[in-house]
Amino acid sequence: MPTVVVMDVSLSMTRPVSVEGSEEYQRKHLAAHGLTMLFEHMATNYKLEFTALVVFSSLWELMVPFTRDYNTLQEALSNMDDYDKTCLESALVGVCNIVQQEWGGAIPCQVVLVTDGCLGIGRGSLRHSLATHNQRGESNRFPLPFPFPSKLYIMCMANLEELQSTDSLDCLERLIDLNNGEGQIFTIDGPLCLKNVQSMFGKLIDLAYTPFHAVLKCGHLTADVQVFPRPEPFVIDEEIDPIPKVINTDLEIVGFIDIADISSPPVLSRHLVLPIALNKEGDEVGTGITDDNEDENSANQIAGKIPNFCVLLHGSLKVEGMVAIVQLGPEWHGMLYSQADSKKKSNLMMSLFEPGPEPLPWLGKMVQLGPISDAKENPYGEDDNKSPFPLQPKNKRSYAQNVTVWIKPSGLQTDVQKILRNARKLPEKTQTFYKELNRLRKAALAFGFLDLLKGVADMLERECTLLPDTAHPDAAFQLTHAAQQLKLASTGTSEYAGYDHNITPLQTDFSGSSAERI
């Protein structure tokens, strides 16, 4: 996921730090040292990450737009000027703007805020922003929570004792709370020095920027792979005591299925699957950035000569038009597939399904899927002209039924008019009349629209009084009976008000023959 590094360049960051030796350091130098360490790590282990650099004091400035060139980011660190007072709110507004312009509101993003814990003074300070948080309108809302999925990591160029001597730590913790609790505050353990700054940024790297390495297995074939971006733990909301589910480092392929059968399923996240080549000594090659082009070319040549199952799988899925179902954990599956990046380039991707025994209803339970050879006859037909999917559900789903929709008044009016039209054609339309009447009755009970039942009952009684002398005698009996049944249902308390109860035609001497047909 993209990263925005937000660097504090206010005057408070120029405060000197007493470090052993003759060279004098400022807090901004310690911050730049820590960020250099972070950028070097990402250049080696997280080089697909897009990163932007923002500096701020009372205003904010985008120093480096989203890039994968970490040399540019490191150069920008040495070219930062010093400005005036701290205004964290303006920096957070800037982060919102640049992320939404580049990635929209759906892509998760990590924000690394580097500051010394000084909150600013007067209007625009973090204290003032938090104090007026509940008094704002929609036009000038506080930028947290971010309008996109995010994690906010605050790197403080101060130790815990210094922050606790004021209310700085409480205010910074409030920022994490406002971001829905997504994020963490890091402080320097012990005195301010380069070693302790490295230790603090090392904790951030371990938490958020450690590459996810796994072993992809299919039978006796295996391949070491990196999954990018790193899969996040998934929490099932329905559980009473939810425990985050983490995918296994052993990704075992359990089967293959046609792309047409799996279609475009709902997924939690999508990830690149990159092969990690190993030389004879067991060291990784081809995954990092080397300083010398010749060394890099020779490493790539070595990696290209070693057979790799990941490459074989990618090519096979692309040619055969299939996807591989992969086991991520207990009752948790995903799929591996080839996705075209351009006309000539494609990538091996992995999508994660929701945990559960039946993540895709049209495939049924994953444990019940098996090879074609186990079937008595080929489920795809001899000419590959049919498919066993989608499985037909035992119970009709709600969207497969003729549901009653009364979003607009015209829908309700149409249903009532249909009943009245059939009422005027009784007894010939007895079956249709009661079918439409019961449909309206069930919908009214489901919506709690009991007044509608009484209103339709009054209409039917009125229709009964307007029957011509030439009308069949059975029509009056049926209308009166239907009106009485609706009035009983409109009370909501009688046995006739049950949802599953149906109004049946009244048995009369005139309707005997028609009742038998019904």
From Swiss-Prot:
It comes from the Eukaryota. Keywords: Acetylation, Magnesium, Metal-binding, Nucleus. Pfam families: IntS14_b-barrel, IntS14_C, VWA_2. Residues 2-204 form the VWFA domain. InterPro entries: INTS14 (IPR039841), IntS14_b-barrel (IPR045814), IntS14_C (IPR046471), VWF_A (IPR002035), vWFA_dom_sf (IPR036465). It is found in: Nucleus. Its main location: nucleus. Mg(2+) binds at S10, S12, T86. One of its GO terms (cellular component) is INTAC complex. GO terms for biological process: RNA polymerase II transcription initiation surveillance; snRNA 3'-end processing. The modification N6-acetyllysine is found at K418. Transmembrane segments: none annotated. Component of the Integrator complex, composed of core subunits INTS1, INTS2, INTS3, INTS4, INTS5, INTS6, INTS7, INTS8, INTS9/RC74, INTS10, INTS11/CPSF3L, INTS12, INTS13, INTS14 and INTS15. The core complex associates with protein phosphatase 2A subunits PPP2CA and PPP2R1A, to form the Integrator-PP2A (INTAC) complex. INTS14 is part of the tail subcomplex, composed of INTS10, INTS13, INTS14 and INTS15. Belongs to the Integrator subunit 14 family. Component of the integrator complex, a multiprotein complex that terminates RNA polymerase II (Pol II) transcription in the promoter-proximal region of genes. This is Integrator complex subunit 14. The gene is INTS14.
